């Protein structure tokens, strides 16, 4: 099935050709090779327009002619198949979630990792962190074995549509034009997005998402969410949609000796946020030294709090699936099962019937995959 993220802005007359080009590439990306006639039928464009666009893409090396269609079931003259050259370009993808390490990869247009690298921050905040990131990107660019389409960066914090980091406290970045700064330093297009949004894009494009609406909950040093509804990434009026990690999950009404304990201070300055019980450091502390049965009970207690937080979101958005991105040994099993049961308890059947709650199939590479999609979408209109 051909699908793409729905444009978030109006398509102006001057953008029509780019939109048509995107439609052709989108079909080839998701549906595989087809003849010019097939492309015209599937996109609704005229054959003349498709032939013109295919000629342009052939000249750029983005597509290749693959020989004639098979004879079986074919009436009339066989067309020449055209396919996307997934090895024509590489993408530099960088994940900045880790407090100590930069994670990066060279990825082809199909999302396959060509090379993966890590580097340690000299200092994970401020201008030094930015300099470390720039050096890391240069090293990945130098390792590319074919032309680079662009650089995608999945950053913590609140990031606007222009790739400006409005606020990333753990990096001490505020109002930083990260995309523009890196583009000037590296000489290639750079696209920057929030790490949870990037994980949602990666799941949408490469992770086998079920339908038009999903939420990806990223669980690492912190907790965040990326949301796609009806094929559009939800960013909110302040570009801060998905900050579920800072919804209160434990408060003074909870028994101090109860399953999740008393509300704990959060890095945001408040207490009892979901992040204080669900972030990986908190989960690992909770199960440390416990036998399997007790560990399962501890994880189930966190799953209950997660379900309480997610239930109104599922009800409001009528999501098809919720995807947990993080270690499956902690997020799968009792935590996942309990969260799903609580969501169903607290919502009307019509809103949660058929809801899938699963752990990502992309593993720890979800934000890297999403960083690559930032470039695919920004440069080619493909997602």
Identify what each model region corresponds to.
Residues 1-118, 124-142, 146-147, 252-253, ...:
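ATP-binding/phosphotransfer module of carbohydrate and carboxylate kinases, centering on a glycine-rich
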Residues 30-31, 206, 220:
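Short helix-capping/turn signature of helix-turn-helix
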Residues 68, 118, 170, 238-239:
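Short clusters of small/polar residues that mark proteolytic maturation junctions
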Residues 102-106, 201, 224-228:
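Short beta-strand scaffold segments in enzyme catalytic cores
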Residues 113-213, 334-345:
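Glycine-rich phosphate-binding loop and adjoining helix at the ATP-binding site
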Residues 195, 220, 371:
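Active-site glycine-centered loops adjacent to acidic/histidine catalytic or metal-binding residues
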Residues 212-277:
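Glycine-rich phosphate-binding loop of actin/hexokinase-like ATP-binding domains
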């Amino acid at each position: 099935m051909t699908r793409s993220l729905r444009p978030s802005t109006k398509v102006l007359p001057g953008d029509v050709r780019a939109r048509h080009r995107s439609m052709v590439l989108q079909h080839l990306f998701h549906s595989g090779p087809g003849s010019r006639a097939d492309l015209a039928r599937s996109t609704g464009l005229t054959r003349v327009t498709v032939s013109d666009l295919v000629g342009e893409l052939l000249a750029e090396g983005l597509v290749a002619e693959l020989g004639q269609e098979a004879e079986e079931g074919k009436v009339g003259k066989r067309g020449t198949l055209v396919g996307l050259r997934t090895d024509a370009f590489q993408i530099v993808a960088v994940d900045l979630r880790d407090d100590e390490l930069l994670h990066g990869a060279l990825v082809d247009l199909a999302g396959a990792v060509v090379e993966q690298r890590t580097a340690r921050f000299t200092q994970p905040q401020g201008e030094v962190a930015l300099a470390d990131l720039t050096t890391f990107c240069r090293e990945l660019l130098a390792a590319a074995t074919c032309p680079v389409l662009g650089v995608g960066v999945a950053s913590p914090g609140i990031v606007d549509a222009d790739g400006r980091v409005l606020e990333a406290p753990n990096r001490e970045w505020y109002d930083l034009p990260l995309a523009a700064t890196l583009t000037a330093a590296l000489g290639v297009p750079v696209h920057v997005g929030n790490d949870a949004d990037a994980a949602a894009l990666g799941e949408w494009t490469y992770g086998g998402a079920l339908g038009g609406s999903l939420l990806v909950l990223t669980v690492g040093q912190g907790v965040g969410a990326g949301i796609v509804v009806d094929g559009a990434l939800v960013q909110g009026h302040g570009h801060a949609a998905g900050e579920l990690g800072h919804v209160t999950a434990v408060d003074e009404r909870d028994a101090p000796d109860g399953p999740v304990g008393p509300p704990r201070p959060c890095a945001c300055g408040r207490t009892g946020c979901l992040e204080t019980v669900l972030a990986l450091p908190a989960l690992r502390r909770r199960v440390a030294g416990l036998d399997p049965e007790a560990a399962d009970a501890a994880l189930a207690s966190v799953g209950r709090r997660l379900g309480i937080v997610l239930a109104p979101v599922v009800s409001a958005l009528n999501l098809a699936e919720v995807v947990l991105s993080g270690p499956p040994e902690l997020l799968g099993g009792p935590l996942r099962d309990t969260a799903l049961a609580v969501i169903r308890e607290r919502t009307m059947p019509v809103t949660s019937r058929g809801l899938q709650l699963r752990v990502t199939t992309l593993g720890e590479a979800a934000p890297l995959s999403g960083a690559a999609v930032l470039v695919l979408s920004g440069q080619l209109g493909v997602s």
